[in-house]
Design a protein with these regions (language model features):
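N-terminal alpha-helical modules
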Residues: 2, 24-142
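Bacterial N-terminal signal peptides that target proteins for export
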Residues: 2-13
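Cleavable N-terminal signal peptides
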Residues: 13-14, 24
Length: 142
């Protein structure tokens, strides 16, 4: 059985994710800040988004580690639990979006674009949520 604070944290996190889903998921490839608007073919665009996803993941991991350095042990556990839930949400959400194109050549591209956009958004969210703490302890936000 989960403690009430952890259960409440999970519910709050999932509600937040559902609220942000519409913002983060619609037409990733056509978003003004999408990194792969130039390539013409599906294969080129998919490769671009896979590469961009790796870059977004590296940036997310960097800010996640930096945030962990300024948190107490309990706060680190909360962040870790939230991050695990977010990863499950992101992967499941992007799989559902990909499945809308099942059997089509766009499916891998849609999945890669979704992963990239959601990962980039998570980095932005973590910076917004923990930026004050990073500044307080003299850690650069980037």
């Amino acid at each position: 059985m989960q403690s009430q604070p952890v259960a409440h944290l999970r519910l709050l996190f999932l509600a937040t994710c559902l609220f942000l889903t519409d913002h983060a998921s619609a037409q990733h490839m056509n978003a003004p800040d999408a990194p792969c608007r130039g390539p013409a073919s599906n294969a080129e665009t998919t490769a671009c988004f896979i590469s961009a996803s790796k870059t977004a993941d590296e940036q997310l991991n960097k800010i996640y580690v930096r945030i962990g350095e300024v948190l107490s042990a309990d706060e680190q556990k909360d962040l870790q639990a939230a991050q695990r839930l977010w990863l499950r949400f992101r992967d499941t959400n992007c799989s559902a979006e990909r499945n809308l194109y099942a059997g089509g050549s766009a499916a891998p591209m849609v999945y890669a674009a979704c992963i990239e956009a959601n990962t980039r958004q998570r980095t932005t969210d973590l910076k917004a949520m923990y930026g004050w703490r990073l500044q307080k302890f003299g850690k650069a936000i980037e």
